[in-house]
């Protein structure tokens, strides 16, 4: 979550003489220079989820398009449940990171286009479960009629699910739903148990699948 931390980590990897460095940039512009140092030291640099100049190759997810799909799934749910009446919506984003801001913008644009009568009553940052829980609990106090929550990631979605369970208990209304990405174990369990997660847009699989794929690509490239 901090570009300076990533710079320090990459510098340490350079000093240690690593063969390959895999990075998911918090801020790609901020780490371009140190990644160039790695390349100049004959270290392969693999960038995941962003486009960088100073990398051996980039494995890119189109984050805006991913956000549009999350928002589209939420809009379909809104239109099915509420029609022209619309409903109150919460977005749990993370604008501190450029790629997640792109994803958030995709969600907002899709909601505006495809569910124009829905009202986004709160937009709060939530990158993990704790932030999602705290943000959603606070939002529900001010907006108890929220029906849809759109999240840029699985952590915020898990926290939102816990907050909604705290509000509604075991009675899960069929007109309330969480829409997100990241196929976490928690999201799968929520859907299997009939909780508040309605849709997870999974492009790359869970964190372990992503890790396996990017590692395999990196090793094949470096071979």
Please state what every model-predicted region is.
Residues 1-223:
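A residue-level marker of the well-folded mature domains of exported/periplasmic proteins
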């Amino acid at each position: 979550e901090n570009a300076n931390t990533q710079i320090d980590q990459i510098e340490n990897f350079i000093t240690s003489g690593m063969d390959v460095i895999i990075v998911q940039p918090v801020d790609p512009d901020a780490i371009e220079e140190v990644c160039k140092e790695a390349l100049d030291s004959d270290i392969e640099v693999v960038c995941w989820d962003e486009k960088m100049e100073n990398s051996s190759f980039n494995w890119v997810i189109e984050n805006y398009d991913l956000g549009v799909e999350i928002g589209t799934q939420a809009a379909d749910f809104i239109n099915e449940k509420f029609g022209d009446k619309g409903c109150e919506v919460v977005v749990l984003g993370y604008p501190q990171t450029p790629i997640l801001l792109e994803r958030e913008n995709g969600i907002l644009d899709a909601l505006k286009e495809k569910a124009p009568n829905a009202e986004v009553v709160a937009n709060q940052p939530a990158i993990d479960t704790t932030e999602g829980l705290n943000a959603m609990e606070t939002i529900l106090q001010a907006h108890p009629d929220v029906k849809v929550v759109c999240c840029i990631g699985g952590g915020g979605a898990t926290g939102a699910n816990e907050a909604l369970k705290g509000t509604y208990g075991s009675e899960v209304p069929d007109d309330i739903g969480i829409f997100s990405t990241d196929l976490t174990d928690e999201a799968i369990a929520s859907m299997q148990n009939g909780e508040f997660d309605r849709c997870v847009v999974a492009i790359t699989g869970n964190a372990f699948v992503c890790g396996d794929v990017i590692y395999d690509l990196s090793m094949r490239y470096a071979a």
